[in-house]
């Protein structure tokens, strides 16, 4: 996937209502716009990645214990600790994490949906 197609999918998601809870003292609308801006600022050049479900994700979220192929669309944290992944087959977003060493495996939180902001905020 190229950057333009990823941006189209992300922006379509951000244009829909979100299930993201307001965890601030701000009015909900302002909080959501602030969080959308943070996500947009964290977008990266799309890259193909592989991720693995954590034990919790297989037991509680029904993910199969296998390697999954995704497109990484956003990253934050030290050396890309937290990631927003996109499944191009379904346009669902997943949150993932990995250690600070680039060679470490990427693990899926487990939840996924077409709500980019909700998944990004984990």
Predicted regions mapped to residue ranges:
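Acidic, proline/glycine-rich low-complexity IDRs
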Residues: 62, 85-122
